[in-house]
């Protein structure tokens, strides 16, 4: 499966990013490049909406950590919402549920 990256600005003036599909070793660079580009362009807090995220592997989690660090350097925030139970479990097992603000 492939990855589609949708994004919009929310009413809270946050950049909401919706990865659609799978984030793995093959699609992680695309996600990283797009989000880093958006951070440079918009310089806003980010919400990752996992509603349509079907799968994420360790390379995808690494990309999210890179995004987290980049936002921290800019005094910006990231939150993750609407994760499916199997994906939340991966965040829980790796301890990233304590790093990221995860809601829903």
Regions found by a protein language model. Give the residues of each.
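STAS-typified acidic loop motif
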Residues: 7-33
